[in-house]
């Protein structure tokens, strides 16, 4: 994958102020309009700029191969599931080469993806995923993040809690030598979780894709080869 964005960079777009638009929503809109990865995703058919983050993770660590079972937590709008579907060459009629995606928000169908419109934190959701998975997973991936508050310490802790929940679930469903990928925000409180992950996986890395905004504290935890 190339990160050459020369064909996707537009002139800076200014956003007119509006009485109905908050400062934060105006800033978000300005970032979207001037983000080359947003433009690239639109042109290349990906549902979100987050697709390029997973592509970069794969380019770095080579985790995805055909004939895999993958669980995608917090999947909407489907960018990561799209990428995974392409990388494992998923199809709608394969039992051993499939992706199970979970989110409260609906996503449009993707080849080889079985979507569950559920709250991951509801009591029966894990049981349902395990039932649909019908065996052990090769990869559990989570791009879940809490709604940001603008307070970095709060956002850090909230997203870390989501990562911890995803990690505990991954331990239940991953096969030996399976992999776990999850978003966290840097902030200092992640060290305890990292130590737990290192006890369960042979290799644990931090990775910040170039497609992650430079001002963001997000990084990705990449845990390789479950013990």
Curated annotation (Swiss-Prot):
The keyword Amino-acid biosynthesis does not apply. Disulfide bonds: none annotated. S-adenosyl-L-methionine binds at residues 78, 80, 103, 119, 143. The keyword rRNA processing applies. One of its GO terms (molecular function) is rRNA (uridine-2'-O-)-methyltransferase activity. Its main location: cytoplasm. Pfam families: FtsJ (PF01728). This is Ribosomal RNA large subunit methyltransferase E. The lineage of its organism: Bacteria, Pseudomonadati, Pseudomonadota, Alphaproteobacteria, Rickettsiales. The gene is rlmE.
